Amino acid sequence: MGNRSLTEADHALLSKPLVPTSAEHTQTQEYPRPFVDGSNSQSGSELQASPQGQFGEKALTSTNRFIPLANDDPGMQHEMGLDPSMRRRREEWAERGAAKIVKDVVDPATGELTKHVVKMGIKDFKFGEQLGDGSYSSVVLATARDSGKKYAVKVLSKEYLIRQKKVKYVTVEKLALQKLNGTKGIFKLFFTFQDEASLYFLLEYAPHGDFLGLIKKYGSLNETCARYYASQIIDAVDSLHNIGIIHRDIKPENILLDKNMKVKLTDFGTAKILPEEPSNTADGKPYFDLYAKSKSFVGTAEYVSPELLNDNYTDSRCDIWAFGCILYQMLAGKPPFKAANEYLTFQKVMKIQYAFTAGFPQIVKDLVKKLLVRDPNDRLTIKQIKAHLFFHEVNFEDGSVWDDNPPEIQPYKINAEAMKPLQKVSESDTTVKMANLQLAGNGHADTPLQAPAATSQEHSVISMTAATAAFNKDYTSQPKLGSKSSTSVRSASNNTDREVIQKKVSKNRASVSSPSISTTSRGKDNRSRSSDAFWSRYLQNMDERVLLMKEVALSTRNLEDSPVGLENVALDYKNPLDIEPPTDSAGKFYKKMFLITNLGRALVFVKRRSLSMWEEQEFELQFELELNDVEKIRFISDQVLEIDGSRTIFIGCKERAVLMKLWKLIHNGMTAKPKVVSPKSDHKMFDKFILQKRQNTKKKNQAPPVPQSNRLINGLPDRCILKTPEEGALHTKRPTSLQTRSSSNYSKLLARSTQMRKNMTRTDEK
């Protein structure tokens, strides 16, 4: 154990026994249970280390030394080879550190169950593979020698705990597991034991790993899986808070999956155990102040709450924030706040800077927005979360959350049902009434809201997948010609107050008409599908409709600003029947149309007819335009598309080079004037792009050349060497990957490769 030995105070702190309830003595349990004996039971305590990316210092030594010696036959031979005094010392510690448990034994004579007190320690288990490790603990698989049951044993070094002053974390986790023993959704602690050097926690074994591995395996989870696991997580968190424990480090790595694919919360080393307050109720139930502030800086960067970073305090509502982050990650496949390092991640958390991925379900988006709020007073309570429309089919009262079988794990795919706006639910059901209160954005029942909440009907309008919320409101009424209006919209993407001023100047054109968009169910939609007949080949399915259309000017001479702006695009929305067919002649370029559909897709169509070698041939370029500059543009509603960075154009192909060329083409043609204004500049760019695209396609269809040999010439592969037949000399072609390197670095690389070639030549001669 090193130069320092454990004192009596250290042993007293690390060796508090687990005290079972009176009900545990009368129950029949096939697993061993703790025994009430404080005099001789030396119970260890667990330490959950900080995984990668978590706050706190890393281990100074390797955690492999925490793993106990596998006590199989080779291990026994190793024990036999020890010095007799050392072997006797180990046996004494195995006897002293063993846990006294009550075990049900069947009397062979009478056939009755009798309770026997037995000792179980390190010699009663066979240790196997390592399941995981942390900064000062390791988790190994252990098998009971008598029953063959598998357990997860957490091993902690006593010396390291005392030297790094981590004993308090072990004590906290031990007390938390004591209070939570038998709670659904919480890892079960059976008993603890120790030897001279280590503490051991005998825990429930989770064969399916952690929740993060499940998300990484499938990339994301569909709505059914997300609802199933989210309901279990929030119910387990509710049980924690009812017992007076705040986890403070909920994340996918600390959520494990048992043999039945049910969630189990673990890692209570940083938990906060609240003191019990005097009860003011008639039933005498314990009361805990869940809003008591704590200044301990604990948690994980991607899931830490903003009040801990901004105000240096946290309470039980940090668990609700972490739940919102996990719910987002289930559907998106990544945390909402993720950056290159922890500092940048903290900056995103403090600014509530996150964006929803394309096609994110509307109902889940509504819930996440009300959880990831800067002010904890504005976040939903657990009761309001359970009453949300997303959990409308989940019954948290009858325990079916834990009894239902898990669904088939499938990744999330964008579908029309998920993109539908939230419907106003019936007022008759009590549970649905709670959902309406939650949908209206009410905060905690105990704390007043700082801003008025929108009604359910207004929320339904805001959720429409059209250009903006203000634009949706104007869809329901015809605009007056010659009038000017300004509409203010409050953004719901985070808790900061953003106002987007949308100015619409109507033109005196008879063809300008507002399509009638109904905010009710699709069955009451009065629109005729014939209006989408022309664009039917571009729509994904029967549920997709064209909501907005704009004819974009083609000549950069006529563009003062980007046509993506509100003033230029959102102005002239048209009915598809009012648009002349894009195939009508309009010069070399036919037309460029900008569309928005109810599934949140923004499409740009370019039609032209080449007059050269591909005469009478029509080229169609289809882009999916995702506009994210929420602070300035907000053209696409926050219910549709939000992506970090500047405007990005996606094409329906897998060629990255084509994508970049298209971006340059559209960006230069729409947002800036060319240095030399020429009506042919756009045409030349387009012709050059089409020509290069056809050439790239031909090259792609050709079979790649087979290299003559695997030898390196000048340290470079054969494909980098060109041989001129006339000269018969070898010319080194500089690889494309080295184009960005400086000439000095390339010279050094070439010199080194030349030396390698000489060495290879000498080897061949020998």
UniProtKB/Swiss-Prot annotation:
The UniProt record lists the EC number as 2.7.11.1
**Coiled-coil region list:** none
Q: Name one GO biological process term.
A: positive regulation of cytoplasmic mRNA processing body assembly
What is catalysed by this protein? L-seryl-[protein] + ATP = O-phospho-L-seryl-[protein] + ADP + H(+); L-threonyl-[protein] + ATP = O-phospho-L-threonyl-[protein] + ADP + H(+)
What sort of enzyme, by top EC class, is this?
transferase
Phosphoserine is found on: S294, S296
Per the record's keyword annotation, is Flavoprotein included, yes or no? no
Q: Name one GO cellular component term.
A: cytosol
How are the domains described in the entry? The PIF-pocket is a small lobe in the catalytic domain required by the enzyme for the binding to the hydrophobic motif of its substrates. It is an allosteric regulatory site that can accommodate small compounds acting as allosteric inhibitors.
Q: What is this protein called?
A: Serine/threonine-protein kinase PKH1
The protein's organism comes out as: Saccharomyces cerevisiae (strain ATCC 204508 / S288c) (Baker's yeast)
Chain's gene name: PKH1
